[in-house]
Amino acid sequence: SWLHITGSTDGRNGFDATPSGNPSLFGFDNANEAWFSIDNTDVNTLVAGEPYRVFVRGDRTIDVSQNSSTATATTLRATGTLATGDQTTNLANTQDNFNFIGNPYQAIVDMNLVLDNSTNLNTNQYYVWDPNMNTQGAYVTVDLSTGAPTPSGSAANQFIQPGQAAFVTTLTNADASILFEESDKATGESMTGVFRNSDQFNTSTINIDLQSQLAYANNGSMADGALLKFVANASNGIEANDAAKLGNIDETLSIVNGGHYLSIETRDLPQIGEVIPFYLSNYRQEDYVFRINLNNINGVTAYLVDEYLGTQTPLVNNEENVISFNVNEADEESVSPTRFSITFADSNLANTTIDKNSFALYPNPTNTGEFTIQLAGSSADRLDVKVFDMLGKQ
């Protein structure tokens, strides 16, 4: 099957006509980091390795005049001469610039090999768009030291697929280029569901995935995610192995370091009292869950801090921690992008576990503002208590 490529109201310039004339096929200006719409399809032709972004509504049986048309299964086809031999493309010469690149081969390719042989490109990660993430797709950062994706729910790995485009970043302010060689092909690998997940690594990490409550209940896709990697004596500043964040159409979760927004950050081992802030924006739902996996976080206890509720939730090491929260767009503090962070405390200062059946608060509700708390079996000399109403307000 084929798909509609739109960009005019009357079908000129090789486009399918739509009432709005809105474009659906785009290129990317690497030097200026800006998308631009393709101006025609009757003169321009596809070139192996040249990347595009295309909105896929479905195959050509759908009605493009209706926004509510149901999507259909679509197969993209291209014809032409196969690209063989070395394929080199010059890229932006500005440090940290995102460069849109395409796999020129009709074969799976190992991006570790590609970037190792390229010039002045960051070899630590690359970025792909996964249409299976969230409801409209989301950017995924692949850590090339492990092949692991962030968010972790993606099937993306270090192997770029035939026909797939991706982003890489320029390392320093100097000439940069990407080189694909025949020896980069990974013919023994299987296709991923992005267009097999790698084994998870065994270092100290905190993987934070965001999911709507509905998607969580129905085993759906992640909305977005971020990854913290902890390595002894690593720098807490911004370096090449820290992956900048690409913003999504919908929910976007970033790690904040100074003025930098990251999808992966490599840091020194966590210290007591250290705070790592997050930036979470573009809420599309009201009810969410964080799925936070800690691996080998030793010597400290990590807490998820919720500034809106005034809570600190301890995170269990080497387990998945599922934490529900909700937002209300009418409440600015509720949807504040800086609402959440992670902090660390001495793991020896463990909180006493309280059986909820031994706890009572009455009268509830109270009309006088006074109430009694009863806690059976507690030997504590002093207790600090925070009380919240049904809306989550303290």
What are these regions (language model features)?
Residues 1-394:
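Compositionally biased Ser/Thr/Gly- and acidic/asparagine-rich
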